[in-house]
Amino acid sequence: MDKNEDVEIEYWCNGNKRSEVHYNCNGKEEGLRTDWYESGAKEREAHYKNGIAEGLRTDWYESGAKKMECRNKTWEDRVGNTYTNLHGKKTEWYESGAKKSECKYSTGRITGIANTWYESGQIEFEIPFKIGV
């Protein structure tokens, strides 16, 4: 493991990068975190703010095909509790590139229509969601 001020890099036994994590002055994850498969293919990119997942996260299959993309949002309630949840569109794909599922989140709860597809492209489910119901 290399540590250079605010960046920590870990390696697989074969010498390929395993992860690269940036830290703020308080020692908490800050900014982009990247993880790789042992083969060297990128596995995940996620953004952090003060140690909490915040913003875009993208995952890939080892083949390089996009697997999942979503956003996290952090907020604080009236008594100072901090919450991080999915917020916005979340999309998943089959390794072939065909869309697998798509739904929208609002502060961690599915809202609107959630869709799932078979790998052939045929719709599997279309489920409406409404917050509070």
Feature names for model-found ranges:
Residues M1-V133:
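Glycine/tyrosine- and acidic-biased, solvent-exposed loop/turn segments at the edges of beta-strands
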